[in-house]
């Protein structure tokens, strides 16, 4: 199978581009080489090789976490061996597991 070249175009903030290009240059690479390495890593690992830990939970999630931490969260049990449709499962959850 013959490999063919493809091009990608995207928009970015000029300041970010200039700062990134300076770093890339310090490594003795070109932006094209770095972007190709980035895409190859994504394809190889089936993941994005960027630290996404900066993602923060929203207000609702933080409130739910606080509720759990305080011990005031409503709990219920649904038998794992029982089979439910998505609709039945949702009804069970909304009815406190009943």
From Swiss-Prot:
InterPro entries: Arc_rbn_hlx_hlx, RelB/DinJ. Keywords: Toxin-antitoxin system. This is Putative antitoxin RelB. Transmembrane segments: none annotated. Antitoxin component of a type II toxin-antitoxin (TA) system. Its cognate toxin is YafQ. Pfam families: RelB (PF04221). The keyword Metal-binding does not apply. The keyword Iron does not apply. Belongs to the RelB/DinJ antitoxin family.
